[in-house]
Amino acid sequence: MAAVFVYLLRFLFIVIGYALAALAASLFLNLLVMSAVDLGHDEPLPVALGSMLFSVPLVALWIAYIAFFPAMLAILLGEMLGKRDWLYYALTGAVAAAIVIGFMTGTSETGHDLAADPGFALAVIASGMFGGIAYWLVAGRSAGAWRQPGRETTLPGPSGS
């Protein structure tokens, strides 16, 4: 019975971590796009915050939907291999974002393909890295701990060098 509780708790950490990673990636992407287009400079602060409060969760839903399969593959590999370093999750977030860009390429009906724009592609990859680091902060630091009951789940101490 205790093992079932451990598995359910780990699953809850994974779901919460994925949701917060999508929100973090969305916030980062929104900030990059707003700064690149110079939005928010002429608007009062409540107007700019109001648009962010609406667009960040909406874009987070889109990110969570479109990046689900590559991210779940990375999370599953991280859990099975016990990957706990932030670099693994940052790089797999970038790879998941690159896969999303690959699926987006050529799907524009208006003639202007955002996925072909290198600046937009780099912004999406950077937001994928940011989301991967956010996932690591919530759930990645204890990846694989459910498989090895004696393994330490905290961060390592100082090296002493």
Predicted regions mapped to residue ranges:
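Juxtamembrane/disordered regions of integral membrane proteins
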Residues: M1-S161
